[in-house]
Amino acid sequence: DVEKRRHELYQVVKPSRYIKIYYSTKNISVYAEGIVETCEMENFEMLTKGQISILCPDIYWYSTETQIAEYSKIRGAFHFIFPDNDEPFPIGQYSTQNIMTIVNDGDEVGFILEISGGPAKNPTIYNAATDEYMQILGDIKDGDVITITTKTGNKTVTLEREGVVTNIINRLVSGSTWLTLKQGENKFYVRASEGLSSLKVRLIHRNAYLGV
């Protein structure tokens, strides 16, 4: 029933409403987000046709799969099966590797960075290839989460402390660069003036494509 299907479409595609569109082939699975501008159907033709116009402030198609690179001085090593003897066993392993590596198979794009842990001071993320950096001035308390978004059109720096989220973009040190991921392998390293060993850093990335 064409009329029934048309009304089902209207229930999903509503002008001025948010919409998320998925596109998939055997090689790629992506999505885009936007606001429905119009949904126009030709109701009185033998072959029903229509056109949906969607305004997308973010111009990219994003992979449905997320990649995460992590830094922590302590790497988890806990196992739920306990040893049968009384010998000591590790619940964590101390890491001397400050490098985070992530591969970008899409176009150059920004990413999300989460810094937590603490106490620490003046956390800094460096691009290992260019020495460009982002530094947040000030203290990180135990339980804090700093979230940095470097995506075009959506650059933010926020602090979540005791359940309250505040804008701290003013704590971004002068000379900092809004870091991005180039195509291919990207390496970043972590520094802090105090408390580096207590920091946990997560770099969250989805491959992004201008066309699919």
Model features per residue range: what roles?
Residues 1-17, 28:
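Compositionally biased, low-complexity regions
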Residues 15-63:
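Short beta-strand and beta-hairpin "edge-sheet" elements
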Residues 62-70:
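Short, charged, solvent-exposed linker or helix-capping segments at domain edges/interfaces
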Residues 69-212:
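Intrinsically disordered, low-complexity segments enriched in serine, threonine, and glycine
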Residues 12-15, 19, 23, 45, ...:
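Generic ordered-secondary-structure signal
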Residues 8, 18-21, 40-42, 97-103, ...:
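Intrinsically disordered, low-complexity boundary segments flanking structured domains
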Residues 32, 65, 197-199:
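Generic domain-boundary/flexible-linker signal
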Residues 13-16, 42-45, 55-56, 74-78, ...:
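Short, surface-exposed linear patches
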